[in-house]
Regions:
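Extracytoplasmic electron-transfer domains, predominantly the class I c-type cytochrome c fold
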Residues: 193, 485-558, 689-690
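Bacterial signal peptide processing site
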Residues: 25-28
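Mature N-terminal segment immediately following signal peptide/propeptide cleavage
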Residues: 37-86, 94-96, 119, 595
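Repeat-blade elements of multi-bladed beta-propeller folds
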Residues: 47-51, 87-109, 133-156, 190-216, ...
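C-terminal motif of bacterial Sec signal peptides marking the signal peptidase cleavage site
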Residues: 21-23
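Extracytoplasmic/lumenal domain signature
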Residues: 68-82, 110-131, 156-189, 221-257, ...
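Bacterial N-terminal signal peptides that target proteins for export
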Residues: 2-14, 532
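Periplasmic c-type cytochrome electron-transfer domains
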Residues: 53, 399, 406-420, 424, ...
């Protein structure tokens, strides 16, 4: 693991930075107590918020870089965070205001750069010099008034924008707020973070959360904090409490023990209407819901709230009682479309299943007809799948909807034979069949979409929405839970029966060489990344038993866990992408696409394969598409700019009207992030985080900025 860069502050740097942000408050307690401005002064030259603007459309009016000259783009500067490690990722969409860029490293250090040169101005280490305990995924920061707000694990920090130091008075003297507090569960026994930055409305920061997909898990409350003090102003319970609408769609005690239904992909604010829009994920555990019978409002829903109070305005549940990890993967996008010759403000929402939902903004009515389709209800004992699901009739899906034998790979006879063997073993009968024990389940589109967290881009001038799509099937097998050891009952669902990994989590066979017993026990208690905190589910002796097994591979006792409220009869035995014998997708290309959809009509304007596998391309097998993570930006003057592809490390520019490739370059690592564009001193730049690390691809830690010569 390479060490992360430590702060380097020369006098010249600090003087230059002070000139850039003159007028920002000093980090003393008295000034921290004053309410900061609700948002930075927006300018066409800036990329002032995550997603580019408050509508989250990834749209810019900057026009120096054009379809005619984009092919002449050159690297303007690079910034190596020196923080990449095996498996690390860097998904930040940088914020740029007044010539300063703010973003994060793979180890979640926050930094500020001169956006014209890439020169570091300050850097903040939230972990006090300690190495990271696990991989982190983080998509950016909020810059507002005198402060930079970002999340590290359960800590929500407010940093002084000028110096990068925590602001006393935000959450007390520490300069951070504990996101585990205020959820109705013991704070030290749950795991809560926020991979996507929140939004600013007036004097509030409104934010979703990332919680474990296994049990125990925290509830996914949407919360608003005072920008000045970090005080919690309001919460919206996505798992309703007694007396709240939607409570009847869960078991009676679900509000005490259920988790998930969280807006991990971010939230969007309409400041003129004082409305907050959120898109939520599934309830935990993802694949077996006997503990959460019912439709599970407000999981898998688009929710509109009063941004000042958190009061419910409207909601629409896209998927009832999710059993396939089909979270809504991106923040809602605010768009204006044409209906009967008149402009109508709307909310667009992409899904992992490859659908685009379009809702009238104030009341939430779908703007295209919706079909209610009957679903199979055969399931494991205790499970009660929803008997029907909703589907928009338009736009048509941007991903294939069902896997058949005709869709299996024909890359080579051997690849087809391997894929056919797997297909016949799983024998899928319906894209919404409940996960089972007897044969397993093929989830298609897969758990990474369809659409993913990069989200779409939207051109308000044409009404076209642009979205990259993954075309990967995933394999899932459940098995009865084994109570022979606490490890088998608690951990094997992700890490395999013998610590070998392969069921959605990494191998732990060598964890004793990487961590001390105390570190492992702390991780079990407090959680780490997507792993839940087990402090609420077991006592110290139970955690010690699991630690001993992880360190030695030997079962030291046979304590049972069936009495736990988090105990389920079934767990994950296998969970991975459907691949052939050589590690390529087991289905026919395209394995990833880039799509343009007209939201005025619901029709697809164009769709092209997106991405390549370099080894296959060298054999003449080109234009296959690959999975992609990160989104596009669209320019008023005709460009669609996107990196995102996992294996070819390319950054591309397309003609937004036709999908024609205009320019491409190879990055130091995959740009699994959304780029930002901005202007400093009369020059337009485009910057992308090159973090890699997805699905076994090499990791990186470099930001690369491009400009015209």
């Amino acid at each position: 693991m390479l060490p992360s860069r430590r702060p380097v502050r020369t006098i010249a740097q600090l003087v230059a930075f002070a000139l850039f942000v003159s007028g920002c408050a000093s980090p003393d307690v008295q000034e921290a107590a004053a309410a900061p401005p609700s948002s930075p002064a927006a300018s066409a030259a800036d990329w002032s918020v995550y997603g580019g603007n408050t509508d989250h459309t990834h749209f810019t009016t900057l026009s120096q870089i054009t379809p005619a000259n984009v092919k002449t783009l050159k690297v303007a500067w690079t910034f190596d965070t020196q923080a990449a490690f095996k498996g690390s990722e860097m998904q930040a969409n940088p914020v740029v205001i007044d010539g300063i860029m703010y973003a994060t490293t793979p180890t979640l250090h926050v930094f500020a750069l001169d956006a014209a040169t890439g020169k570091q101005l300050w850097i903040f280490d939230p972990n006090n010099g300690q190495p990271p305990s696990s991989r982190f995924r983080h998509r950016g920061v909020v810059v507002t008034g005198d402060r930079v707000i970002f999340n590290y694990r359960y800590k929500l920090f407010a940093l002084n924008r000028k110096t990068g130091t925590p602001i006393p008075g935000f959450g007390g003297d520490s300069g951070w707020v504990d996101l585990r507090e205020g959820l109705g569960r013991p704070a030290k026994e749950i795991s809560v973070s926020a991979s996507t930055p929140g939004v600013v409305f007036e004097d509030l920061l409104i934010i979703g959360s990332t919680v474990p997909e296994q049990l125990p898990s925290a509830p996914g409350d949407i919360r608003a904090y005072e920008l000045a003090t970090g005080k919690l102003r309001w919460s919206f319970h996505t798992i309703p409490h007694p007396g709240e609408p939607g409570y009847e769609t869960w078991p009676p005690d679900a509000w005490k023990i259920a988790g998930g239904a969280n807006a991990w992909a971010g939230v969007t604010v309409d400041p003129k209407r004082a409305m907050l829009f959120a898109a939520t994920g599934s309830a935990s555990y993802d694949f077996y819901g006997a503990n959460r019978t019912g439709d599970n409002l407000y999981a898998n829903s688009v929710i509109a709230l009063d941004a000042r109070t958190g009061k419910h305005v409207w909601h629409y549940q896209v998927l009832r009682h999710d059993l396939w990890d089909r979270d809504l993967p991106a923040a809602p996008m605010l768009v204006t479309v044409t209906r009967d010759g008149k402009p109508v403000d709307a909310v667009a929402q992409i899904t992992k299943t490859g659908h685009v939902w379009l809702f009238e903004r104030e009341k939430g009515a779908p703007m295209f007809p919706v079909e209610e389709r009957r679903m199979p209800t055969v399931a494991l004992d205790g499970e009660q799948p929803a008997s029907s699901q909703r589907f928009p009739t338009l736009p048509l899906p941007f991903a294939r909807q069902q896997l058949t034998r005709d869709e299996l790979t024909q890359r080579t006879p051997e690849a087809h034979a391997a894929a056919l063997k797997t297909f016949e073993e799983y024998n899928p009968t319906h894209p919404y069949e409940a996960p089972n024990v007897s044969k397993g389940t093929i989830i298609f589109p897969g758990v990474d979409g369809g659409g993913e967290w990069g989200g779409p881009a939207f051109d308000p001038g044409t009404g076209l929405l642009y979205v990259n799509s993954n075309e990967m099937a995933w394999l899932l097998k459940l098995v009865p839970r084994n109570d022979k050891s606490l490890y088998a009952a608690t951990c094997a669902g992700c890490h395999g029966d013998n610590r070998q990994g392969g069921a959605g989590g990494p191998s732990l066979v060598d964890i004793g060489q990487r961590r001390t017993a105390d570190q492992v026990m702390t991780m079990i208690k407090e959680g780490s990344g997507r792993m839940p905190a087990f402090g609420a589910a077991m006592d110290a002796s139970a955690m010690k038993e699991i630690t001993e097994y992880l360190m030695t591979g030997k079962v030291t006792s046979t304590a049972a866990v069936q009495k736990s409220p988090y105990f389920l009869k079934y767990r994950t035995a296998f969970f991975d992408i459907f691949l052939d014998h050589e590690g390529y997708p087991g289905i026919k290309p395209p394995w990833g696409t880039l799509n343009a959809i007209d939201l005025n009509t619901g029709k697809t304007a164009w769709s092209i394969p997106f991405g390549e596998y370099p080894k296959l391309a060298a054999q003449g097998i080109t234009n296959t598409g690959t999975d992609s993570y990160g989104g596009a930006i669209v320019t008023q003057n005709g460009l669609l700019l996107i990196a995102a592809t996992t294996y070819d490390n390319k950054f591309r520019a397309f003609d937004k009207a036709t999908g024609k490739l205009l320019w491409e370059t190879v990055l130091p690592a995959a740009g699994n992030a959304t780029p930002s564009t901005y202007m400093v001193n009369g020059k337009q730049y485009i910057v992308i985080a090159c973090g890699g690390g997805k699905n076994g691809a090499p990791s990186g830690g470099t930001y690369v900025a491009f400009a015209l010569p």
